[in-house]
């Protein structure tokens, strides 16, 4: 996969041959986002008291990220920031849960499993006792589609600009990477790719859609996500002084190289970002 796969002309895709209809596009987007919102509310309601189901936490965070991407697309920075904060509130809970199940699959020593299980239990109790889930439910109840809706002409302009903005943001991010991309650089790139993918996903049923590019972003997000997970596991293992930390560190290095290789295959592009259309 190269930058061209993520920035090639929209006309190369069959969906682009249809005459754009802004009203229909807006209706399709709102239908999709309404489903995201309904699911986010359902998952938030399901998380009442510990122990929390891991998949429910994961899906809630995913749909909050999708709603954040929609708020960014409609240029509602305050709403987007609140949604991003909600995701952050649940980040450590999600990480510890994924780490615990990762250790179980690796048949880690019982002592290591107990330490992580205890940390997970404490984090779940903290999330429950600080009212974070209540705050998320309240925020979602107030964040109706009607309150953040934009005029049809505004949405049409945003859809028309989506390709150019995506190309510019991706190209700029790649040019900022050091020759051997660092942990922080890869983490920032992953968050950007995730946001770009969700924006593409939201527009999937419109005449501006590009399924090919959306799937390319999804593959890149998965590669970077696998690496970022191993990075978090490595740091947790060191902090908790787990017996299996050396094995985790070795695996981390392997995933770090995979992520770097994926980025090297992308570019960086030689052309100015404004030319990547």
Where are these regions (language model features)?
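Function-determining surface determinants
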Residues: 1-277
């Amino acid at each position: 996969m190269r930058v061209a796969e993520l920035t090639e002309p929209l006309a190369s895709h069959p969906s682009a041959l249809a005459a754009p209809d802004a009203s229909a596009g807006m209706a399709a987007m709102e239908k999709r986002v309404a489903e995201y919102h309904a699911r986010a509310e359902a998952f938030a309601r399901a998380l009442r008291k510990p122990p929390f189901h891991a998949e429910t936490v994961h899906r809630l965070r995913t749909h909050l990220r999708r709603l954040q991407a929609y708020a960014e697309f409609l240029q509602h920075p305050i709403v987007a920031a609140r949604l991003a904060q909600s995701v952050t509130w649940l980040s450590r809970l999600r990480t510890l849960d994924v780490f615990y199940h990762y250790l179980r699959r690796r048949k880690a020593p019982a002592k290591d499993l107990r330490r992580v299980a205890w940390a997970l239990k404490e984090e779940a109790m903290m999330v429950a006792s600080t009212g974070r889930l209540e705050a998320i439910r309240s925020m979602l109840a107030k964040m109706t589609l009607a309150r953040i809706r934009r005029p049809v002409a505004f949405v049409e302009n945003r859809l028309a600009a989506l390709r150019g903005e995506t190309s510019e943001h991706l190209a700029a991010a790649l040019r900022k990477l050091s020759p051997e991309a660092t942990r922080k650089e890869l983490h920032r790139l992953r968050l950007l790719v995730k946001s770009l993918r969700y924006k593409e996903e939201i527009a999937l049923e419109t005449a501006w859609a590009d399924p090919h590019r959306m799937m390319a972003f999804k593959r890149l997000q998965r590669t970077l996500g696998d690496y970022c997970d191993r990075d978090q596991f490595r740091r947790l293992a060191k902090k908790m002084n787990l017996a299996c930390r050396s094995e985790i560190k070795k695996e981390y290095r392997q995933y770090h190289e995979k992520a770097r290789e994926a980025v090297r295959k992308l570019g960086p592009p030689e052309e100015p970002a404004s030319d990547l259309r």
